[in-house]
Amino acid sequence: MSKEERIYFENELLARLKSLEWPGLTLTAVKKGLKFRLGKELVAQLDFQYLVKAQAYTLLGRVFGGPIFECCSKIVPPYRSNLGSDACFSFTTSGRQDKRFSTNVYGTISAPEIEEVGAVCSHIRAALENYYIPLVAGCILPSQRTIEDVLASPTDYAYPALFIRCAVAFKPEIISKEKLKEVMSNKKIVKNKDFDLSLLSVLEDLAVG
């Protein structure tokens, strides 16, 4: 892929992403990504990373603001974060085999030929709209899917038990008693029994059903 072809593709992708929206948040398409604001505060980003040798793109996401992040920042767990950053949630599609971003098992989308640009841009927009934007939004403003997302991939969260505690404290109706039991029995969420279970047990009175 020539530099000119790459610039053309990235400009076309930017144009396709400009109309994306999410309730309660302001989404701004920028070159190689999407920014999320809560009010005027920048709280999260989705970024496309170009891999020169592979001539392909991966998608990265980070949440570093919002009510859940602020709550998590006030408590220091007695063990290491799953993440190598200050974010409360972070992921990369590189190496993921879920095929949500790409159709291959590498988690990458090959840089398209000129005649394929339209189709690839449509595919990426659909992937963001249907999965990645709701995923990131649920880490900023808790919703019914927030707990399910943590259960699906706990290692994408700095401290998954603390994250759930803060999300439910902000919006108690997002968890049921049955779901709380599932959370408390998950070894990838409960990494330190004394600390994490004490955090989560507080939610028993808040859980519905």
Regions found by a protein language model. Name each.
Residues 2-10, 35-209:
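Intrinsically disordered, low-complexity regulatory regions enriched in serine/threonine/proline
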